[in-house]
Amino acid sequence: MAVPETRPNHTIYINNLNEKIKKDELKKSLYAIFSQFGQILDILVSRSLKMRGQAFVIFKEVSSATNALRSMQGFPFYDKPMRIQYAKTDSDIIAKMKGTFVERDRKREKRKPKSQETPATKKAVQGGGATPVVGAVQGPVPGMPPMTQAPRIMHHMPGQPPYMPPPGMIPPPGLAPGQIPPGAMPPQQLMPGQMPPAQPLSENPPNHILFLTNLPEETNELMLSMLFNQFPGFKEVRLVPGRHDIAFVEFDNEVQAGAARDALQGFKITQNNAMKISFAKK
């Protein structure tokens, strides 16, 4: 059954997520698979009973949210297909950027006696009862720590150029070899002062195994798997014990490995870490 879409929004609402995954791990994984579509301002995840299996991803650009929704709809994430739709209202962070943010006194509204409700008020409340999710987009989720406590990988990246997709571009669910996933940072989009990873000085001959360097401390096997498993032929990620900054990614053949290397070369996992990819030595 198709998921009904509302008006395009900077924020996408995701449900049917695996409830057994820890909150911090879920945030990192969501960032890993959605950052390819554009700049992420925030990710909201709560472990409260009411909000389990749900999350909100807030993009800087509406076009990024649209591409993410259409490309990742039904994507198997922790063995469950994601259900994605636009959030029904702007999140607080977007409302503040637009200048439309209105502070809400939640405590006072909560204590409001029922006897003061007029028939018109009751009707309005009942009419909005079908969309309990909206409140979570508009402000902090109850029981959730402030986003300042989120992993560093989730933070807004000042100065990073936002992803601007070509007009009318809608990425397909699967990527053919050689296609660049939307939002993957090409070398020319690195931060000022950083040298673009043009052509390595000593390029190894093609190999079905890729060698990754300049990875941030937060990197784990799952995050890299989420990035690379969108490419045909992906087999596995291998980390090096005692080294968080390097990893190996194996594909079925050299052509498939080369397509993934070209697409994700220079991908910025964090503000200061542009991933460098080369063929592993044989």
Swiss-Prot record:
List this protein's GO terms for biological process: mRNA splicing, via spliceosome
Give the UniProt keywords, A-Z.
Acetylation, Methylation, mRNA processing, mRNA splicing, Nucleus, Phosphoprotein, Repeat, Ribonucleoprotein, RNA-binding, Spliceosome
Q: Which residues carry this modification: Omega-N-methylarginine?
A: 152
Q: Which InterPro entries match?
A: Nucleotide-bd_a/b_plait_sf (IPR012677), RBD_domain_sf (IPR035979), RRM_dom (IPR000504), U1A_RRM1 (IPR034407), U1A_RRM2 (IPR034409)
Q: Outline the segment boundaries, as ranges, of region: Disordered.
A: 100-132
Q: Provide the effect of residue 52 to Q.
A: Abolishes RNA binding
For molecular function, the Gene Ontology terms on record are: DNA binding; identical protein binding; RNA binding; U1 snRNA binding; U1 snRNP binding
Q: Where in the cell is it found?
A: Nucleus
Per the record, its GO cellular-component terms are:
nucleoplasm; nucleus; spliceosomal complex; U1 snRNP; U4/U6 x U5 tri-snRNP complex
Give the RRM domain ranges: 10-89, 208-282
Q: Which SMART domains match?
A: RRM (SM00360)
* Chain positions found as Phosphothreonine: 131
What family classification does the UniProt entry report for this protein?
Answer: Belongs to the RRM U1 A/B'' family.
Protein name per Swiss-Prot or TrEMBL: U1 small nuclear ribonucleoprotein A
Please name the source species: Homo sapiens (Human)
